[in-house]
């Protein structure tokens, strides 16, 4: 079974974890142990188009400040 990339996104990074709850708690996005540049289209849009600087929080296509 191939690795499944989570759709959760923090500051333009996504968690690429299998069998972990990073999508729920965002832990591996925060500690950076398995983060990569976000490939999720909605998150890319958020990360690239956020006008809130470091205040941008991207989760599953939502881009709140």
UniProtKB/Swiss-Prot annotation:
Induction field: By heavy metals.
| Pfam hit, one | Metallothio_6
Give the signal peptide as a residue range, or say none if absent. Answer: none
What's the domain of life for this entry? Eukaryota
InterPro entries per the record?
A: Metalthion_4_echinoid/annelid (IPR017980), Metalthion_4_echinoidea (IPR001396), Metalthion_dom_sf (IPR017854)
Keywords on record: Metal-binding, Metal-thiolate cluster
- Keyword set includes Transmembrane: no
Q: GO molecular function, one example?
A: metal ion binding
What family is this? Answer: Belongs to the metallothionein superfamily. Type 4 family.
Protein function: Metallothioneins have a high content of cysteine residues that bind various heavy metals.
Protein name, please? Metallothionein-B
Which species does the entry assign this protein to?
Answer: Strongylocentrotus purpuratus
Taxon lineage: Eukaryota, Metazoa, Echinodermata, Eleutherozoa, Echinozoa
Q: Which gene encodes it?
A: MTB1
